[in-house]
From Swiss-Prot:
Residues 16-35 bind DNA. It comes from the Archaea. This is Uncharacterized HTH-type transcriptional regulator MJ0272. Residues 5-59 form the HTH cro/C1-type domain.
């Protein structure tokens, strides 16, 4: 799944470490999400969207693999 997490993080002048602490996850989790190597749980995806004050689909873009 593609995402705009890095864009929103930069928009708010947050480091990966800052965002990880605010969301209660590891920096490695943020890195993996930004690189598209890890899809967050639905709970975490909603938490991220709420943190930035946007809709979940503004950050995460679903791509049909078929």
């Amino acid at each position: 799944m593609k995402n705009k997490l890095k864009y929103y993080r930069a928009l708010h002048n947050l480091t990966q470490e800052d965002l990880a602490k605010k969301l209660g996850v590891s920096r490695q989790t943020i890195i993996a999400i930004e690189k598209g190597k890890y899809d967050p749980s639905l709970k975490l995806a909603f938490k991220i969207a709420k943190f930035f004050g946007v809709k979940i689909e503004d950050i995460f873009i679903y791509e049909d693999d078929e």
